[in-house]
Amino acid sequence: MAESRDGRVHALDEVAEMDLDALLPEDEIAALARRGPVVKSGPEVTRLFRVGAPFWLIAGPCVLESDALNLTVAEALARISDDLGLPVIFKASFDKANRSSPGSPRGPGVDEGLAKLARVRAATGLPLLTDVHLPEQCEAVAEVVDVLQIPAFLCRQTDLLVAAGQTGRPVNVKKGQWMGPAEMKGAANKVRGAGAAGVALTERGTFFGYGNLVVDMRSFALMRQACEAPAIFDGTHSVQRPGEGAGVSGGEPGHIPALVRAAVAAGADALFLETHPDPAKGLSDTTNMLPLARLRPLLEQVLEIRAMVRPFEWEAGARG
């Protein structure tokens, strides 16, 4: 739900039709009564970054937008966390450094972006994740967020991996679209060796010719077994059609539910889902974000599937 200056409470599917600047200003949001997320920002986040941890979720808009929108999404995630008993980490990027077109919006930048993320944490208690692109960004980012993320295109950059690990924060490394699952062992070891509190690896599809991605459902077991780290499924970037649009990536968001359900049945340890009240109006990844109103119903199905899955004794890469 979201509250506007006139005191009215709006359903999430109404938010997309609203002027988001009309939502409650940031200095009043922290005063609203809230239920807390299952895992709050702080040291307890680290326990998620081990094989056998409870199932969890990374979610949020692709890029940081207005405080009103960021907090609308974060508040919804905090309620989902509480209602479903699901640990949730809020994600959003301060800089989309690999946009297809030089004219595409990139985000607010490091300083403003970290301030926006801090306001999300103050308002909701949610743990925070954001990605880093340069080694010199890591220390400042680690002062604000709970988890650093390495983008897929940078998953072999040793200096960046080491700098992220040296912060002592947990690190999520996205698997490059050209990488095999077991090849991610090198990235995991670089981060661990530098002192990270934990490491997770995220599957986000593999190139299948030009402009297409496919997901090998064996990847979760293979990565977990080879790298001794939780294997996450990115259900939104996996439906991208890279380079398909005119200067932007395309996407097939209608396939998100099927891939997410399959990944959980195949043993994914956690999910990564970008979500927005109105993806078409987002500043980035408009063609592959999940509508915020669709998130809870999908997660309810996912948790039912997760509860049903029991590893076979001989199964490769069991969750532990």
Where are these regions (language model features)?
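Glycine-rich, proline-tolerant flexible connector loops at the mouths of alpha/beta enzymes
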Residues: I58-N70, V88-V110, T275-M289
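Catalytic alpha/beta core domains of metabolic enzymes, predominantly
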Residues: T167-T275
